[in-house]
């Protein structure tokens, strides 16, 4: 009974089984995906490109020549835009940054270009007869830097050629001791020559040349972008989670200095130390301070310049007279601020090197530019001794809490002949600057090196000031930037396949996307970012156009120059590069048949070997950057398939156009074709009538020639009667039957009407026959089709019934088996339960039997 009840309960479930089978068949069917092209996606790749400069037009004095040539830069944007890229992580590496190399090359080129038109110092490469000049040094005190050392300034006389080359004249000038060297073969110690005369070409800086640093903004051309890391404790190497995109960097002052970094940017929170490899003592350590330390430098004595003419257009400027006290140049730094800064730096170094004692010492030796802190102050090159700055020891218990106005005075020396830092074999002569010189700068960073080769178990680490490689100066400002190339073309799988259909253009519904930057949707999913394609594509083109206008204005502003500066050349390169990139993208879109489209479907099937992720995971969980990295190895293959597909499609369209008139029968019924049909009909009828007239005339002419006069066209010719129908009646009685006659043509209109009537009747009969035939064929086809449908319907009913019966039988058998098994299981469980329940009874019976 239980099995029968189960069978009855499961008999009604065959419908559910059928539905489940259908669902499985639908789900198992593979869904075709097709490649879709998107233009304007927020994707970028690391790149190396030509950067151009932007600078404030009012940042320099127009009366002097600015060595940085910022007048050739484009104006800075008054409202610079910085778009934060949410949910984006990017790798940065300040030690392998092409922006640093590019800035270094630019500064070298600017220095070289500023010296090209200047006078060479070859006439001064002669024997100098020099004596020591002390002036009134004995009357000075040490309160402001101390007296000048003995032999610090030399009073030299020499012979120099005049405008007439075979004549010489006697001249004199004052030179600093660092700028002259004694001649070895002279024991009088009065013969000297200028330093570097035997190894370098010395060029005098042109009059009114200013070395005052002016902020330079490096900008990326259209089609490129600059990514900026905003992590406050970023080490300069590794991943950055707070990324934004900018078109230009902040204003970077190209300060050429050693040991101390001047007038740079500060850390936002605490002191940051950066190095390519802290364990390698050969690597320079860059220290970025969080609070600047002011350094004030002075050259007290008052110099007067003297002109020495050595030929037409060759004027040498030397120190002709020193007025007032001769005292050293010097720099003052607040002791409290400096020691507080060193304490913070030592704390960071201890954290990096395992809480060891940090010792700062002076430079270990080398060129004067490295041993001393060298920099330019109002046109004079200062070389300051920093021993007082780097002479301290810091351990865990070392702190500096003192405050006050105590200052550290750094003795400085001035050089006029500078060994060019950018390349070997060149030197520069800086003419003396008249008047007293004062300059104030901010120390924003340090360049340090760590001593190596000591005991690894030592508890002390020694650090010394370093410098000389100007790339470290630029690297300290460009550490948070990198250049990327925008790749607006993206491919992804969708369900849409290209169709040639008529469709209306619809506007994008998301107005808020207009305010996003080009890469503002970089952190969004692919589905969310795809709605901003219009904005991004428009910004790409408008950015190119705007940038071209800015570059053209900058180039026009320097047309009066005989030679473009390095900035002008870079602007031209950036202009050409931007247009080339845009045209390349448009060319690819044209090759793929996607010109003017932001979303372009194709007929290329998506291969799961490229990516087997589902559409939901791709469009709702991945960003365009993540997707681009996944299919990067297959991009070139996909591009090739898109091109081949478009070529095949164009070939098919060409073949189709050759059969265009037969493409659609509905075109035969258009009003234009009907008018053409009527015209053809009129021409045919007119031709027939014309032929009829011609043949009638020819027949008449032929009969006239034979001597026959035709009857009138109005005469009715009796028709011939048969032999059984005589024309008369016997005995002449009775009525004559109506005569039959053939009607002749009655004029031209009658002829036209007769032919037209005959043609219409003929056409009517033929069309009627054709319609009857077509109706018969349609009837036969309908009957046969209906029979076929009935046959298939009966077949479907038969197999569905068979499937139903099979499913019912299967379910019944399953139910019976389950029911029988359930009965056995229940019976076994009952027996086990009874046995357990009877255990006490059996025990009692056993005890009773034992007692008996």
UniProtKB/Swiss-Prot annotation:
Coiled coil: 629-663
Region (CD4-binding loop): 363-373
InterPro entries found in the cross-reference section: Gp120_core_sf (IPR036377), Gp160 (IPR037527), GP41-like (IPR000328), HIV1_Gp120 (IPR000777)
Residues exposed to the Cytoplasmic side: 702-852
Region (Disordered): 717-739
UniProt PTM comment: Highly glycosylated by host. The high number of glycan on the protein is reffered to as 'glycan shield' because it contributes to hide protein sequence from adaptive immune system.
Biased composition (Basic and acidic residues): 722-739
Pfam families, per database record: GP120, GP41
Domain of life: Viruses
Glycosylation site residues: 87, 129, 136, 141-142, 155, 159, 189, 198, 242, 263, 277, 290, 296, 332, 339, 355, 385, 391, 397, 401, 405, 442, 457, 607, 612, 621, 633
Stretches for region V4: 384-412
GO MF term set: structural molecule activity
Annotated motif YXXL motif, positions: 708-711
Region span, MPER: 658-679
Region (V5): 455-466, 457-466
Signal sequence annotation: 1-31
S-S bridge residues: 53-73, 118-206, 125-197, 130-156, 219-248, 229-240, 297-331, 377-439, 384-412, 594-600
Keyword presence, Coiled coil: yes
Extracellular side: 32-680
Region called V1, residue ranges: 130-155
Protein known as: Envelope glycoprotein gp160
Source species of the chain: Human immunodeficiency virus type 1 group M subtype B (isolate SF33)
